[in-house]
């Protein structure tokens, strides 16, 4: 098995992962309601992860703001367990497709992002 080597590998990871997320009974309804144009969003997410893994400046956006909005639109029902499920799918998809230094970096970044996002979403709920 190879490591993540280029944008095409990142796109494979992102597309495979979100196919699972969209079909999941718990995560699917949240994502499928929030995202109207999946083709565009998958490109956007590929840009995000390409930026994270290869330090390329191809992503623009504010993921934290978007996730806070999604939580608000779901009556503040996004839980740490849902982030854990998201992370479980991400780590499992990486393990199915890749191994190596960048694969491990993608796992580490996702762990950090999930923790940070949930903490910031929780904090934003306190600001009401």
Regions from the PLM with identified roles:
Residues 1-128:
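Core of compact, soluble alpha-helical bundle domains
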């Amino acid at each position: 098995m190879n490591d993540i080597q280029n944008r095409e590998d990142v796109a494979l990871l992102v597309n495979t992962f979100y196919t699972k997320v969209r079909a999941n009974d718990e995560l699917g309804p949240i994502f499928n309601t929030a995202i109207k144009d999946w083709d565009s969003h998958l490109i956007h997410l590929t840009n995000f992860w390409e930026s994270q893994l290869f330090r390329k400046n191809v992503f623009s956006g504010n993921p934290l703001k978007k996730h806070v909005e999604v939580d608000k639109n779901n009556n503040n029902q996004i839980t740490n367990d849902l982030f854990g499920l998201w992370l479980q799918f991400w780590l499992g998809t990486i393990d199915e497709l890749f191994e190596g230094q960048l694969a491990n970096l993608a796992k580490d970044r996702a762990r950090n992002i999930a923790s940070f996002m949930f903490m910031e979403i929780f904090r934003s709920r306190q600001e009401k």
